[in-house]
Amino acid sequence: MLKKTFAALALGTALLSAGQAMAAEYKIDKEGQHAFVDWKISHLGYSFIHGTFKDFDGNFTWDSAKPEASKISVDLKTASLWSNHAERDKHIASADFLDVKKYPEAKFVSTAVKSTGEKTADVTGDLTMHGVTKPVTFKATFNGEGKDPWGGERAGFNATTTLNLNDFGIKGPGATSQTLDLDISVEGVKQK
């Protein structure tokens, strides 16, 4: 009886360890320009301003057999915002909006991943921006994974969400400019 119990325990431990070993750590490849944090906001209800954050870093764990076990963490430098208009960028960076001197970083850390389809998931986590932390859910799409031409392995995702700027203590330039659309595209390099 003891022998059977030990054998079952050993088998269970081996299976559990094998499942944990399948999750891989990836570093987001921003140096190769294979990752982007883009944003869009209404300009007074007449058009949209598009921009990006140029300086960010992050990593994620990914297991295609168990997507719910995945995690992601992204840190970005708020002063790296760019909208192709220097004066507007200065204004957005000012205390009127992002206040990048007081709040130089924004951070997202996932707390849950829920599969919603074969290649889609809701990624929920804590977003800290402008000194406020709120739960946010991104709609994520798995783009694929595999070997790259340089001998490494990669995985890629896109994720979108809409933020209410008032939730983070940020005043938009008008009633129609209170929501910000985020579109994140990441390609990660598997760490050895």
Swiss-Prot record:
Keywords: Periplasm, Signal. It holds the Pfam family YceI. Its main location: periplasm. InterPro entries: Lipid/polyisoprenoid-bd_YceI, TTHA0802/YceI-like_sf, UPF0312/YceI. GO terms for cellular component: periplasmic space. The keyword Signal applies. Residues 1-23 form the signal peptide. It is found in: Periplasm. Belongs to the UPF0312 family. Type 1 subfamily. PANTHER family: PROTEIN YCEI. This is UPF0312 protein PputGB1_5030. It comes from Pseudomonas putida (strain GB-1).
